[in-house]
Amino acid sequence: MATRGGGPGPGFRHRALRGLLLLCLWLPGSRPGEPAAPSSGVDRLLQDFRRQLQRARPREELEPELLGGPREDCPGAGGTAVYRAVPDTIIRTQDSIAAGASFLRAPGSVRGWRQCVTACCSEPSCSVAVVQLPRGPSVPAPMPAPRCYLFNCTARGRSVCKFAPLRGYRTYTLSRAEDAAGIPPRPDEDKPPVSKAGKDVVLHLPTDGVVLDGRESSDDHAIVLYEWTLQQGDPSSVDMKVPQPGTLRLSRLKEGAYIFQLTVTDSVGQRSSDNVSVTVLPRPYSTGGCSSACSRYHFFCDSGCCIDIALACDGVRQCPDGSDEDFCQNLALDRKLVTHTVATSAQPGAMGLNEGEGDPKLEKSQRATTHNQPATVSHPETRIHSTQKAPESQINPVQPDSNSSGKNQEEGNYDLKSKSGQAGGEHPAPEAGAVLPLALGLAITVLLLLMVTCRLRLVKQKLKKARPITSEESDYLINGMYL
């Protein structure tokens, strides 16, 4: 493609330099014993291209061919394979194996880097040899043998190994003629990436935020782009930031449900998406010690939990639904209604009986007055007068007639019973829990008394049977023996 000035564009020059680099892989390298040939224009062009790439990309991302030295023929390969040495470089084992590379073996009988390269050249699938050099010249003689590691970095027709700079190691990359002449992989061999947005998250307010991590996404080659988008939720209720590729930090979250989508793109443009939900719940209600383990010493809330019975009716709502205080208000209202009903239905003679216990004549006069009063006495007056004590000088005893004395006496007894029953209604009946132990104790006591009585009777009978023989009985028996 040409630029506006008519000259070749940067893309054209980049493709041309790449073609020249592949062409140079076919050129035989100089022998170790031969003098170096004068550099040609192509070599100078390749060196300039190598320097430009080194300035544009960090060292750990460069291919070993661009960082290495001159190419040399593999020993015993007949010119079909060449190797290049890359000093101070080591293979990134985990990343390389994850990308498709494989570890072959570690020869233990090598005495130098040449034997390690020879072992790799003799291995048909070996493409990278890593040599661990001895630690500096300060090591006393004899020098220890270096360690050698062989890898197969070719997968799907391309090199997939990753490298990193590290002193004390040297990497040797092999290029074979059949690899250079191989057919590039077809697009259908490149599998699409697998997107993993992580597990769903549930938060409670207040919260500082959460970090979504999608770096578990994978691809058979490489993922070049991570994209996070909000699919559901109010965008103004959350702040989204990307601290590093593959992650998303959420802050200032408000109550609600959010759905985020992670889309990953591989090196050939294939995409994959995955969703993750973030649920933000409101601040949990403080139950004030409301527990699910309840006993008879607890107050049962309407919501199902319970609190200490001493905390009920203290003016503070410990139950989540406030039933501990509502119950007390209803209980106080019921007590007022019961007291009002009893006081309203009471007759004037009730207070006269309680207040005039010391005077029998007063009791009779009150009973007679009660039965002789008309039925049209108003309740307010009854309630007012029942709370006041009349002086004895104002009370006139009334003697009942002889004909109606028995009837009045029976009615008076009935009134006493009914009034005593009404007075007893104001006090709560004893609980069943107290009556049951009392009845059980009485039954056990009676049973023990019966057992003791039976035991005493048996003992008395045995004593009667075992009483000693009198002198008269003994004489009778002796005389009977001689007769």
UniProtKB/Swiss-Prot annotation:
One GO term under biological process is: multicellular organismal response to stress
* Source organism, top-level taxon: Eukaryota
Q: Does the keyword Transmembrane apply?
A: yes
Q: Which residues are glycosylated?
A: 152, 275, 403
UniProt domain MANSC: residue ranges: 85-172
**Where does the signal peptide begin and end?**
1-32
- What ranges does the Cytoplasmic topological domain annotation cover? 457-483
Q: Which Pfam family, just one, is annotated for this protein?
A: MANEC
- List S-S links within the chain: 294-306, 301-319, 313-328
Q: Which residues span the membrane?
A: 434-456
Q: Which PANTHER family match?
A: LOW-DENSITY LIPOPROTEIN RECEPTOR-RELATED PROTEIN 11 (PTHR46876:SF1)
User: What membrane topology does this protein have?
Assistant: Single-pass type I membrane protein
Please classify the protein's predominant subcellular localization into one broad category.
membrane
List the InterPro entries: Ig-like_fold (IPR013783), LDL_receptor-like_sf (IPR036055), LDLR_class-A_CS (IPR023415), LDrepeatLR_classA_rpt (IPR002172), MANSC_dom (IPR013980), MANSC_N (IPR011106), PKD_dom_sf (IPR035986)
Question: Where do the PKD domain residues begin and end?
Answer: 193-287
PTM-bearing positions, type Phosphoserine: 474
Protein name per Swiss-Prot or TrEMBL: Low-density lipoprotein receptor-related protein 11
Q: Please provide, alphabetically and separated by semicolons, the GO molecular function terms listed in this UniProt record.
A: phosphoprotein binding
Q: Could you say which protein family the record assigns here?
A: Belongs to the LDLR family.
**Extracellular face of the membrane:** 33-433
Q: Per the record, where are the segments of Polar residues compositional bias?
A: 367-376, 385-407
Xref: SMART domains: LDLa, MANEC
Renumbered to this chain, the Basic and acidic residues biased-composition regions fall at: 408-418
GO cellular component: a single term? membrane
Decide whether keyword Glycoprotein is in the record.
Answer: yes
